[in-house]
Amino acid sequence: MQSGTHWRVLGLCLLSVGVWGQDGNEEMGGITQTPYKVSISGTTVILTCPQYPGSEILWQHNDKNIGGDEDDKNIGSDEDHLSLKEFSELEQSGYYVCYPRGSKPEDANFYLYLRARVCENCMEMDVMSVATIVIVDICITGGLLLLVYYWSKNRKAKAKPVTRGAGAGGRQRGQNKERPPPVPNPDYEPIRKGQRDLYSGLNQRRI
């Protein structure tokens, strides 16, 4: 790498993909952004070289040539695309660079630092989509909590016993069972005077 080079950072925050560019020309007064394109579909990551149109593109990963016939069948290159099938975050994360055949990787203007997490059923989403899902989930959860609260409150109110006053002509059933029947009553028949039983002489004055 030459002195006076510039590093720049681009991010794909949800996919944890960072891009650093390197400018190899000291005479350039400004910095031009030509980022690598990264697309993820399931467990496949596809990189697109930002420069050298019409040239045969070669790729390196951590200073090692990749994308040739001798490489793994899960890694392949087609024109300016590099396909990484069954991407592994531990083994395939790192620096990537593309350059035309006949030149050196050190002469490339941009490098890519790639770190991505993939899964078979993953779906790429932007920040607004994630925020919308979170807000909707909070609203639905809050609505369900309110419904449960008011339902339990109404159920408790209906479960309270309702008693009628004496003016309405009724008493509670519990009181009717505990209180004895009024006197006089056939259940309390007086002792006959003609019989001399054990209790025949009790309370004769009142009888």
Curated annotation (Swiss-Prot):
UniProt GO molecular function: identical protein binding; protein kinase binding; SH3 domain binding; signaling receptor complex adaptor activity; T cell receptor binding; transmembrane signaling receptor activity
Protein's GO biological process = adaptive immune response; alpha-beta T cell activation; apoptotic signaling pathway; calcium-mediated signaling; CD4-positive, alpha-beta T cell proliferation; cell surface receptor protein tyrosine kinase signaling pathway; cell surface receptor signaling pathway; cerebellum development
Ig-like domain segment(s): 32-112
| UniProt keywords, alphabetically | Adaptive immunity, Cell membrane, Disulfide bond, Immunity, Immunoglobulin domain, Membrane, Phosphoprotein, Receptor, Signal, Transmembrane, Transmembrane helix
Annotated region described as Proline-rich sequence, given as residue ranges: 179-186
Pfam families assigned: Ig_5, ITAM
- Disease per UniProt entry: Immunodeficiency 18: An autosomal recessive primary immunodeficiency characterized by onset in infancy or early childhood of recurrent infections. The severity is variable, encompassing both a mild immunodeficiency and severe combined immunodeficiency (SCID), resulting in early death without bone marrow transplantation in some patients. Immunologic work-up of the IMD18 SCID patients shows a T cell-negative, B cell-positive, natural killer (NK) cell-positive phenotype, whereas T-cell development is not impaired in the mild form of IMD18.
Q: What does this protein do?
A: Part of the TCR-CD3 complex present on T-lymphocyte cell surface that plays an essential role in adaptive immune response. When antigen presenting cells (APCs) activate T-cell receptor (TCR), TCR-mediated signals are transmitted across the cell membrane by the CD3 chains CD3D, CD3E, CD3G and CD3Z. All CD3 chains contain immunoreceptor tyrosine-based activation motifs (ITAMs) in their cytoplasmic domain. Upon TCR engagement, these motifs become phosphorylated by Src family protein tyrosine kinases LCK and FYN, resulting in the activation of downstream signaling pathways.
Name of this chain's protein:
T-cell surface glycoprotein CD3 epsilon chain
Q: Please tell me the species this chain comes from.
A: Homo sapiens (Human)
Gene name in the database record: CD3E
